[in-house]
Amino acid sequence: QMAEERRYFQLEFDIRNHFKMGPVPYHNVIGIIPGTEFPDEYVIMSGHLDAYDVGTGGIDDGSGVSVTMEAARLIMEAGGKPKRTILVVLWAGEEFGLYGSHSWIERNKDKLDKISNMINRDGGPTVPTGMSVSEAMWEDFALVCSPINDINPEFPFKLEKSEPGEKPEKAWGTDSGPFAVEGVPTTGFQTGDPKGYNFSYGEIWHTERDLFNKSIPEYQEHASIATAVLVYGIANLDHLLSRDGYYIEKKKEPNTKKSKKK
């Protein structure tokens, strides 16, 4: 009433904030679908739980967490019993330094050689359009990915061969980065916006526009099914994916320093 009458008034607030010295304990959330034949071999699918608090994290990384969880639900709902263990991981502390993925690696060094592939979704609510895989992985991925083209003809899927890349010395800015540094394959989907929703990751990234309503339901649905197909297929191979030719082999530089005679 006072506002409608344009009357001036004063408000007084008593705001009490309480702070604790860090570090604050934070936890990864990990679901396990146990392997029936190779329980000590793994396929990882993941997204990260935290977000910049200027928005709600509906896209970064709600679009990755929701697809990861739905893919896991689809596998379980279908009665899936993978040969090797599937780890469904929602990482903690990604935005502040990849803390969750770094911590898991430090605690599980013995598992790194037994990870067939690490798939991480952290790039917006776009739809899988293809993959680029190494020569040694080609036949396995061709087999595993073949059903993806049967899901929805509106979203064609293309598999391509890639050249070996250099193994990174430092992690890039998402949770697959620390795994790549350790030599773990992190082959994931290439994604796009084939229906022209004009989604722009740059528009929402770490801003107040990172909201749930920026998600694209039909892309998210298709991504969930494609992720379930991919992860379950890799988990059911008779062998781990080959790492041959995944990274460029670094040649040892010859020792050209001459020893000094005393």
Ranges and model annotations:
Residues 1-3, 38, 53, 91-199:
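Metal-dependent peptidase/peptidase-like ectodomains
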Residues 1-58, 70-73, 77-83:
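Soluble metallo-hydrolase cores and metallopeptidase-like ectodomains found primarily
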Residues 4, 70-80, 106-110, 150-154, ...:
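Sec-exported extracytoplasmic/periplasmic mature domains
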Residues 13-14, 49-53, 124-131, 163, ...:
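Flexible glycine/proline-enriched surface loops and loop-helix/loop-strand junctions
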Residues 21, 58-66, 80, 95-99, ...:
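Soluble non-cytosolic domains of exported or imported proteins
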Residues 28-32, 42-46, 87-90, 116-121, ...:
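Structural recognition of the beta-strand scaffold that forms the well-ordered cores
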Residues 42, 65, 69-72, 83, ...:
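Extracytoplasmic/secreted envelope proteins and their assembly/folding machinery
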Residues 73, 196-257, 261:
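His/Asp/Glu-rich mid-to-C-terminal helical/loop segments that flank catalytic regions of hydrolases
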